[in-house]
Amino acid sequence: MMSDLNGKRAELARLVSQANRIVVFSGAGISTECGIPDFRSPGGVWSKYRPLDFKTFMSSPAARREGLSRFLKIRDEVGPVEPGRGHAAAARWHRAGKLAGVITQNIDGLHQRAGVPSSRTVELHGNGTYAHCLECGKRHELDWIAGQLEAHDR
């Protein structure tokens, strides 16, 4: 088994060394090594919370508040995280001029924290480190949003 994994690593290294351009497609697996739970596996986020559909989220201030509260709770449970080996590899490929871009399902912003520019990152499900106001479009960092929710609850 280990020799098979080593063979795959060697093949990947060969492909990367020969490549002119690399596109990274990533999902939950790249961030689970960092301590971030995935959403769908047993014990994942959706086993604890029923997903909020987009229509409900957009039409109900209470649903938006609930969704943000859930997200903040998950963030606090996970705690601070650092980019993992996959994020670091993508950043190295960027610095080497080989990375065409990253397309990710993740919302954790770890590709950017590792050194991949936002301009080279497509986040299919958005970014969980900030949000835009639905009324004015202004960007707010998640810590600011958390403060607003806490102030509202007092």
Predicted ranges, named:
Residues 1-154:
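Conserved catalytic core of sirtuin-type NAD+-dependent deacylases
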